[in-house]
Amino acid sequence: MNQVKTNITRNFPHISRVMIWDLDGTIINSFHRVAPCFDSEGNLDLNKYKNEACKHDLIMQDTLLPLVTYMRQCMNDANTLNIICTARLMSKSDYYYLRKQGLRGRGDSNIRVFSRDTLHKYFEADKVSEIYHSKDAVYKSYYFGLFKQLYPNADFTMIDDHKGVLSAAASYGFKTLDAQAVNDILSIGVTLIGETFIDESLEDDNDYQFLADRLQLCWEGMTEEERAEYSCSPQQYIEKLKVA
């Protein structure tokens, strides 16, 4: 865990539930512009990303992934604080896109954005550059520590498609959801099963085989071509949840 001095002057002990959302590959499909900027371990090459992938017209071509439906449900829950924690260096175009999609509020909105361009607000100046240039899991770990200070009584859930980030979140005691796997299952098209599955996967007393059997019914009704579009089978997804 990364223990570092922060600039926060108060915390929010009344917050009891925090959902932390990644952007790329979790709720936004930016693959068309961001994919060339990732290294073999899934970390963002910041220079390449900034120079090649951040043009306004490219950002406006991004699309939404199925998990955004669940995110919007959480945004409508007055008892839930939603955090966007992204590896991006957010530009005006990024914030505009979020507002355009109804994912960025103002004033008393129950969603906050933490990104590389907001580091200076929360961390000492001599640490910002080090955190900024860290790999994704390390970079987000600093924010995880900050969140625990800000919301000391909250139950946290991290939704991300980066396995290293999920492992880091788990080390802080956060619940985790593999966004790639969940989006795959949701995109099969059985919305009710998908949303119920997400809720049940967060419960402590899961019967994983029961969940696998339910998903298997969907899987068996698909053609081989349809199955090839997804990154894992239902049983493989269950195994991922067990690890998380």
Swiss-Prot record:
Keyword Hydrolase in the entry? The reply is yes
The membrane spanning regions, by residue number, are none
* Keyword check for Hydrolase: yes
Q: What induces it?
A: Expressed pre-early in the viral replicative cycle. Expressed with a few other proteins from the first step transfer (FST) DNA. FST DNA corresponds to the first small portion of the genome that enters into the host cell at the beginning of infection before pausing.
Reported function: Following host DNA degradation, is responsible for the degradation of 5'-dNMP's to deoxynucleosides that can be further excreted. Active on deoxynucleoside 5'-monophosphates but not active as a phosphatase on ribonucleotides, deoxynucleoside 5'-triphosphates, deoxynucleoside 3'-monophosphates, or deoxyoligonucleotides.
User: Any remaining note in the record?
Assistant: This gene is part of the long terminal repeats present at both ends of the viral genome and is thus duplicated.
Q: What is this protein called?
A: 5'-deoxynucleotidase
Which species?
A: Escherichia phage T5 (Enterobacteria phage T5)
| Lineage, uppermost ranks | Viruses, Duplodnaviria, Heunggongvirae, Uroviricota, Caudoviricetes
